[in-house]
Amino acid sequence: MSTKKKEAVIGKESLAHKGLLRTITLVSTFGGLLFGYDTGVINGALPFMATAGQLNLTPVTEGLVASSLLLGAAFGAMFGGRLSDRHGRRKTILYLALLFIAATLGCTFSPNASVMIAFRFLLGLAVGCASVTVPTFLAEISPAERRGRIVTQNELMIVIGQLLAYTFNAIIGSTMGESANVWRYMLVIATLPAVVLWFGMLIVPESPRWLAAKGRMGDALRVLRQIREDSQAQQEIKEIKHAIEGTAKKAGFHDFQEPWIRRILFIGIGIAIVQQITGVNSIMYYGTEILREAGFQTEAALIGNIANGVISVIAVIFGIWLLGKVRRRPMLIIGQIGTMTALLLIGILSIVLEGTPALPYVVLSLTILFLAFQQTAISTVTWLMLSEIFPMHVRGLGMGISTFCLWTANFLIGFTFPILLNHIGMSATFFIFVAMNILAILFVKKYVPETKGRSLEQLEHSFRQYGRRADQEIQNQTTHLS
């Protein structure tokens, strides 16, 4: 075969590899789309379902309806990591698609607040499990040089899901607002992407790293050859084999007795909580309520809330581009400074401009500024780093524990926000978030490492080396004291 023909064949194979990788990414990130829609739709549905004759919600039950999904997501994240480690990333996502469909229908036809809270909890199990499994799956199929952009496409689909929720809320609320069951129409739309996810995952291959961890090296290499050039696949399977030597045992909590793994878990939990204590989901879940509190009417607040969704999508696209240019750690710190500034201004100007016609527009502008920093830097980096830092044999469990903490923090914020807003007002509530942002910046500066440009196996080796150095220092100190 001539050189030109060989190059043509290689070029076609390369296009086929990239095409399949894009298909896998698109299909699996429908889990992220559902995550976004199901967390965002409550933003516009709450004012309608809270009314007399519907679910008759009080501030407490309103908080429970919004946050029961988050509590479910915490447990879904915890068990989802173990489930995906045991049954595989692909099969777990297939199960999740069915749970998304069943729980969404349960929420849609809920006759009272208690049933709604129960089905929102079940929906949360699916959301939490997806929040662990999908980024892990994407990280494990991605080449190191493209991992950042591929994994953060899940974050893009999350905010697209939220934008779709806000848009459908505004359209349905404006055109069918007189209907008693308008909120049910908002909720049931989520069954459509769940059906797409289920059918799509039937044609997607399993994670090669999960297959290798189960001793199925031949299957792992076969999958890698579908999404990599042959030489790259061969090199990658060697790295994977080397990484799992001596770690073929079943993952369990006993693994966290090792100091280097315990340190990674500490960092993972910290990163997860940092993402939440910015207060982002108080805006994503209660944006309509915040704008009503500032002075907008319900219909205007629903429409204004679309701006939050649009800026989130634009910001994540920009963040994905930035990840190819900028290191993770500086992005995270700059994002935190930006969100803290926006929250501080909301708190101050809500006092200065209280009762004026300008206040709702100022609050809307500042929430857009807040989301620009949050979605460009913090949210994109959070999910990416959580999928990167854990070693292969505890990746599902470690990410599950970290994401459990993320959703627990999310639940606490989601539940307490409407209560705080009702009792201490908007300004004081946002000042609390400013204080928590300061603590978050200090944590990132002290503990969070840089992960850009390194394979998952190289990161694991680096953490192991750190652990050995720490052990040696402790041993030297013990020897010196004795």
From Swiss-Prot:
For whether the record's keyword set contains Signal, the answer is: no
The residues that cross the membrane are 30-50, 60-80, 93-113, 121-141, 156-176, 185-205, 264-284, 302-322, 332-352, 353-373, 401-421, 424-444
Task: Describe its membrane topology.
Answer: Multi-pass membrane protein
Q: Which residues does UniProt assign to the signal peptide?
A: none
Output the PROSITE patterns linked to this UniProt entry. MFS, SUGAR_TRANSPORT_2
A GO-annotated cellular component: membrane
Q: Which UniProt keywords apply?
A: Cell membrane, Membrane, Transmembrane, Transmembrane helix, Transport
Q: What is its main location?
A: membrane
Q: Where is this chain's protein located in or outside the cell?
A: Cell membrane
Q: Which residues lie on this side of the membrane: Cytoplasmic?
A: 1-29, 81-92, 142-155, 206-263, 323-331, 374-400, 445-482
> In the UniProt record, does the keyword Transmembrane occur?
yes
Gene3D superfamilies noted in UniProt: MFS general substrate transporter like domains
Q: Which GO terms describe its molecular function?
A: D-glucose transmembrane transporter activity
**Membership in a protein family:** Belongs to the major facilitator superfamily. Sugar transporter (TC 2.A.1.1) family.
Report what the protein is called.
Answer: Putative metabolite transport protein YfiG
Q: What is the organism field in this record? A: Bacillus subtilis (strain 168)
Question: Gene of origin?
Answer: yfiG
